[in-house]
Amino acid sequence: MGLSTLEQKLTAMVSAPVEALGFEFVGLEFIRGRVSTLRIYIDSEEGITVDDCADVSHQVSAVLDVEDPIQTFYNLEISSPGLERPLFTTTHYEQFIGEEVAVVLRIAMQNRRKWQGIIKSVAGEMITVTVDGKDEVFALSNIQKANLVPHF
């Protein structure tokens, strides 16, 4: 997923404190609004508890308070990736080859921004998704948002 400059800066700042606590830093998203939201996704093999989220929130808040990279009011949310796991990196796409994904593009391809299909392959920064039997290739930098599609 192509991250904004702010999201890149935030990732550089918060990934180390998250990992120092023993968690996987999955990724983050900054959602602008009247009150913006900084959502940080963490994971571990044992799963994530509310206490884990509180510990990470405390640690990350301390870093953000010192560095002060966000020049507006915002809420900090710490979350597990959940069933509709967001995909941020090529490693995430490689990990979930064969799984269904919903993709929203920054710039439309073939007059559409929303796509859904099966992750087929990853080559460099290019993601191939099979949509209705046809392979579509997306540049990671053009992916605004991507989530796994759970099946129940």
Swiss-Prot record:
Disulfide bridge partners, by residue number: none
Q: Which InterPro entries match?
A: Ribosome_maturation_RimP (IPR003728), RimP_C (IPR028998), RimP_C_sf (IPR036847), RimP_N (IPR028989), RimP_N_sf (IPR035956)
GO CC field: cytosol
Q: Does the keyword Cell membrane apply?
A: no
Q: Which UniProt keywords apply?
A: Cytoplasm, Ribosome biogenesis
Q: Which CDD domains match?
A: YlxS_C
Question: SUPFAM superfamilies under this entry?
Answer: YhbC-like, C-terminal domain, YhbC-like, N-terminal domain
State the similarity comment.
Answer: Belongs to the RimP family.
Q: What is the protein's name according to its record?
A: Ribosome maturation factor RimP
